[in-house]
């Protein structure tokens, strides 16, 4: 028998699909649900969608599977101290593979449009390999942003230890993803270090952040929405979160139990 994994198309997303796409998706899910060779269909981090598809296709094959996080138990370096970042500076970090669909360029464009303030008030960290498709524009925008604010750029595949040190020292993790129909590994870091994320409010990513109370959600994660949020960080007390609920649901053991049982 086979176990498959699938990203779901939620009710709110059907409106964005053409009639042809809706029919095609329905056929694919129906075939998976009624294929005797498939024992289980796992939907990452979304129990309500699993229940929805079980009702729709009169089966019990759909099941939520956790998005396991890497537990960090190492003694981490002090990112702020090592990079001469003041303790009262607001550190906003964007981590992982940096690409257009992750909203990387929109973040830079938003920074560029921000009202000029003391450059020591904000530090923006971009940590992760920059996608070749956006590399030239990334560095052009980064150079312009650096005239007003401090940017720390680590354009390579960062170790878990380095990413963890960055997250631990951050005030907010920026995940204004344009493709928000799936979970994100950044949530595991946010939950472990109790650092809020700034996320889209829609689709699966928004639902997870909202349900687990992992940070800020916004219906606008384009340039204006990001700019508005960044400027609000100076005006309002920054959010604190407790990631324990998310961590309990997304252990490696939970992932393996769903996969193997």
Question: Language-model features: where?
Answer:
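Acidic donor-binding loop of glycosyltransferase active sites
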Residues: 165-182
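Short hydrophobic beta-strand element within catalytic cores of glycosyltransferases
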Residues: 172-173, 196-200
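Short beta-strand->alpha-helix junction loop in the catalytic core
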Residues: 47-49, 61-77
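A charged, aromatic-enriched C-terminal amphipathic alpha-helix characteristic of glycosyltransferases
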Residues: 222-225, 234-261
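Conserved donor-binding/catalytic core segment of Leloir-type glycosyltransferases
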Residues: 85-102, 108-111, 124-126
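Nucleotide-activated donor-binding/catalytic signature segment of Leloir-type glycosyltransferases, i.e.
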Residues: 128, 136-161, 165
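Membrane-proximal helix-turn-helix segments that form the acceptor-binding/catalytic region
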Residues: 18-42
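Short, small-residue-biased leader/transition segments that mark boundaries at the very start
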Residues: 2-8
